[in-house]
Structures are given as structure tokens and as C-alpha cells.
Amino acid sequence: MNEPIEVLAAELPRVVRWAGALARQLRRHDIAVGGKHSGSADTDALTLTDLSVQEILVAALRDMGPTVRRCRIEAEEGTGDLGRFAAESEWVLAIDPIDGTREYRDRIGHRYAVMLHARTAETIHYSLVFLPEEDTDGTWLEVRGDRIVLGADDPARTARAVLDALPPVVPAPTRASRRILVSGFLGREAERARAVSATGLDGVLGAATPGSLYPLMASGYLTGALFHTPNVYDFPVCMHVARALGGEAVWVHDGKRVDFRRTWRDERANMIRLPGIVACASDRSALATLVDVAREWSPERYR
């Protein structure tokens, strides 16, 4: 089951570090690109960096050998030698070259990230996230099975050595945070966050948080997330973190465990999404509350 994971864990960190350095440098220039028209400012943001970073990541994955090329690629953008990978495979490698493109493009924050994860239809097996401008030299998040590491980069050492030296995040028996990130409810996010807060949890919007979803989940600042039709490029990392901490991700309409056997293509945004509303939390009691509050909300993204 772990066939590509050994190769990815050994080879990918240095490439992601290089991609992060490129993103830091390109951000100083006029790199905005048009072409997306879904109606969501976050979804429609696109830069030359997204395209360039994906080109690098795909080329590096291609050159890792046949084990990796036998995987299927799901990439947020269309650049790179994607035809070298399997059209059908048990394994999927999902790439978000720049998560948080709008803030990256507009230079209004430092929580953008280079992300990749490996999954099967059942669950996520490996996730790697690098935030180039968090901390002095960037911040790493790696999830491998149930082991999470989170911490600062050190360019004096190899990327793999840095990750190996980071202490694992230990799941707390109970986490003090009740914060739930609410996202994807087009035009209704504030309303949905208030509904979550009315249950005793603390529904928050992305703009009100001090960083990226993924390290905030791993550190315990956020206990979970409630997303409408999340995409398959970045949100699965949130699911992976939650599960590694002893939590879960479920569909709110029936409370069943989320897998990747059912997806749909959002033609407006030109991306693949999970259907319906997904609740994800490291605290399973919070999950039950989220299912109760959101069960009757519309699963349709565009109405």
C-alpha cells in the first residue's frame, strides 16, 4: 500500500523547498494572470507562479521514476508534463502549486503554501505542505500515515533532514479550541459561521484566522473545518491532519466517512470537488455538532 510513499518522502521535500523559493522571488513582480470566471475571488485568482511551480513539481515527480509515474495526477492547473503519468491508477497525486493565490497575488498575507498529497480512493496517505514566508526560512507540515510534524525550515540542512528532526505533534486528549473554519458557502459564509457559533462551537472565517488552515489544525488553534464542496487539491490535507489527530471527516447529510469514490468537475472553476458539505475535525464530538447544524443546508454549490 505504501509503494509510492517511500519515494515521495525521500525526494519531494527538496523540490517543494525549491518551489517555495521560486514563489518567494516571483511575488515581487507583476505575475497576475486572468482566465478563471467562477464568481469566487479566491477560486479565480491565478498567477504565473501557480503555473511555474506546478511545472517544476510535475517535472520532478516525472523524474522520480516508474513508481511515481504509475500514479494518476490531479493538478489544480494545466501546466506540466501530465501525460507522462497514468490515466487510471489506485494512487492519486494531487497538487496545489500555490494554496492561497489571492492573498499571494495581492501581497496581503504570508500564509500561502506549496502543497502535494498522495491518496487512494479510501483515504490520504502522505501530505506535504511548505509555507515559504511563515517564519524566517519557511515552515513545514508533513503528515505520513498518523505521524504529523510541524516546524521551521533550516536551509543549512537538507529538507528531508529538517523534517526528520522535527518532533511529532502529539494528539491531546482534549483540545481547548472550539474554532471551526467555515468556507465555500458562496455569499453565505458569515451566516453559516454564525449558525456554527450558535451551537457552542466558534465558527470563524478564513480572514479572521492568523494563518493557513493546515498548520492551524495541526497546532490545535483550529479544531476543524466546515467546507461546502471542497476541492480535491488542498482540502484533503485538512482531512489527513484531522484523522492523524484522532478525528474524522464526514459528509453532513448522512454522517458517513468521506472518501474519494465520488467527485465532480466544477466546470465554472475548472476543478474537481467533493460533493456536498464536508465536516472535518480532530474532536469527534465537534463533528457530531457540525452534522446536526448543517444537515439540512443545500449541497448545491451554485444556485
Short names for language-model regions:
Residues 165-208:
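Short loop->beta-strand "edge-of-pocket" segments that line small-molecule binding or catalytic clefts
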Residues 123-124, 148-151, 155-158, 284-288:
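Short helix-loop capping/hinge motifs at secondary-structure junctions, enriched
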